[in-house]
């Protein structure tokens, strides 16, 4: 059983995958998307689901600090619902507040250059989201 973790942004989707035991999350890739053109990366996500034999997807839900859901959160919920319908898989939402900041701190502490951080931040945020989910199940 593998679980895919997604950090959905306006221009990219960070992707992470669990190990087969469901204990650890590893970054896979960053998928470029274009919301305005209706390009959400579903084809690539579908390929990854098949390639890694995924049976659950965790999508980060960006909440405001007071717990409310704003426009970005609503867009992520719609993204998750579209995935659920398209792939016929269990898709769960996971509170991702501060996941990008946590990923940034991780990369800084690992002495990753600013240029490289920019390239991998979404993938690392997906790792933080998925690892949070795995740690709590």
Swiss-Prot record:
Belongs to the YqgF nuclease family. Keywords: Cytoplasm, Hydrolase, Nuclease, Ribosome biogenesis. Its EC number is 3.1.-.-. One of its GO terms (molecular function) is nuclease activity. InterPro entries: RNaseH-like_sf, YqgF, YqgF/RNaseH-like_dom, YqgF/RNaseH-like_dom_sf. One of its GO terms (cellular component) is cytosol. The keyword Transferase does not apply. It is found in: Cytoplasm. Gene3D superfamilies: YqgF/RNase H-like domain. It is an enzyme of class 3 (hydrolase). This is Putative pre-16S rRNA nuclease. GO terms for biological process: rRNA 5'-end processing. The keyword Cytoplasm applies. Could be a nuclease involved in processing of the 5'-end of pre-16S rRNA. Its main location: cytoplasm.
């Amino acid at each position: 059983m593998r679980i895919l973790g997604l950090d959905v942004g306006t221009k990219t989707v960070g992707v992470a995958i669990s190990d087969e035991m469901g204990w650890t999350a590893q970054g896979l890739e960053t998928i470029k998307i274009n919301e305005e053109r209706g390009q959400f990366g579903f084809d690539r996500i579908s390929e990854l689901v098949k390639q890694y034999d995924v049976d659950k997807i965790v999508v980060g839900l960006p909440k405001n600090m007071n717990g409310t859901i704003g426009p970005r959160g609503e867009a992520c919920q719609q993204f998750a619902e579209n995935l659920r319908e398209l792939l016929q898989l269990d898709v769960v939402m996971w509170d991702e507040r501060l996941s990008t900041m946590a990923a940034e701190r991780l990369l800084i502490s690992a002495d990753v250059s600013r240029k490289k951080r920019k390239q991998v931040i979404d993938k690392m945020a997906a790792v933080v989201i998925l690892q949070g989910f795995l740690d709590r199940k």
